[in-house]
Design a protein with these regions (language model features):
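Serine residues within intrinsically disordered or low-complexity segments
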Residues: 2, 9, 41-44
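Ala/Thr-enriched low-complexity intrinsically disordered regions
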Residues: 7-10, 25, 29
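Short, Lys/Arg-enriched N-terminal segments with co-localized hydrophobic residues
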Residues: 30-50
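Divalent metal-dependent phosphate-bond-processing catalytic cores, especially two-metal-ion Mg2+/Mn2+ enzymes
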Residues: 52, 66-76, 80-92, 105, ...
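Active-site flanking loop/helix segments enriched in acidic
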Residues: 53-77, 110-121
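An active-site-proximal "capping" alpha-helix that borders the catalytic cofactor pocket
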Residues: 78, 125-141
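His-Asp-centered metal-binding catalytic motifs of divalent-metal-dependent phosphohydrolases/nucleases
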Residues: 96-119, 131, 135, 153-160, ...
């Protein structure tokens, strides 16, 4: 198979839209079949973002939580909802990408936390302590810039801290995580209403959660 054919076969089709598989691209580059610049140039010419970092990050997180369907389902939902809220709030593409990435990795501290303290004993604070170092390695692997890595790791290290929210990205991640947890935890409607009053600030998030849960 030619180098170009190998590169073409490295596509992932998600919802009818094709994205380039970054992990496969790196393997091709390491094999010196195609240089990384040539890979990017080829896919740029045919109108595909060759370096869709969040697709690669999604795959890394599925591998990270392999065998733990509950955790996989959770981060997928939080990331998707965070991205949707960002778009609804009119966030630019850069912030939307960052918020989605934060949603993907926000709970990566659970695995090392449970390894240290036992299953069911990984509190939100432990997640905040253990998560950033794991997230950093994954974000570096898929090609995020140091500046964005620092911000995403900050969000991972504070996503259970609600009195220090300092930006739209932080607020959107918290609201998305709360909405998913409301459902997954089977929280009573009156408790949801109190949490929404206390935590939710964005118009899109407030409207969605009230509509979704009939508040």
């Amino acid at each position: 198979m030619s180098c170009i054919m190998q590169a073409k076969s490295a596509f992932l089709c998600v919802g009818g839209e094709c994205f380039y598989n970054l992990i496969r691209a790196k393997k091709l580059a390491k094999l010196h079949c195609l240089g990384q610049n040539k890979i990017e140039s080829y896919f740029s010419r045919i109108g595909v973002n060759a370096m869709n970092k969040n697709v690669a990050l999604y795959n890394e997180m599925v591998d990270f939580f392999a065998g733990d369907a509950r955790r996989c389902q959770h981060f997928i939902k939080v990331a998707s909802l965070a991205k949707q809220l960002a778009e609804s709030e009119g966030a630019d593409a850069e912030l939307t990408e960052l918020v989605e990435a934060a949603g993907l990795v926000h709970d990566c501290g659970i695995k090392p936390g449970e390894a240290k303290y036992g299953a069911g004993h990984c509190t939100g604070k432990i997640q905040e302590q253990e998560g950033p170092s794991v997230a950093r390695g994954l974000l570096q692997k898929v090609g995020y810039t140091p500046e964005k890595i620092e911000r995403i790791c900050y969000l991972v290290g504070h996503h259970h801290t609600y009195n220090m929210i300092d930006g739209l990205d932080y607020q959107l991640l918290v609201e998305a995580d709360f909405m998913v947890n409301f459902y997954e935890d089977g929280m009573p409607k009156e408790n949801i209403a109190k949490a929404v009053e206390r935590i939710f600030k964005t118009g899109s998030g407030t409207k969605l959660v009230k509509t979704m849960f009939g508040l």
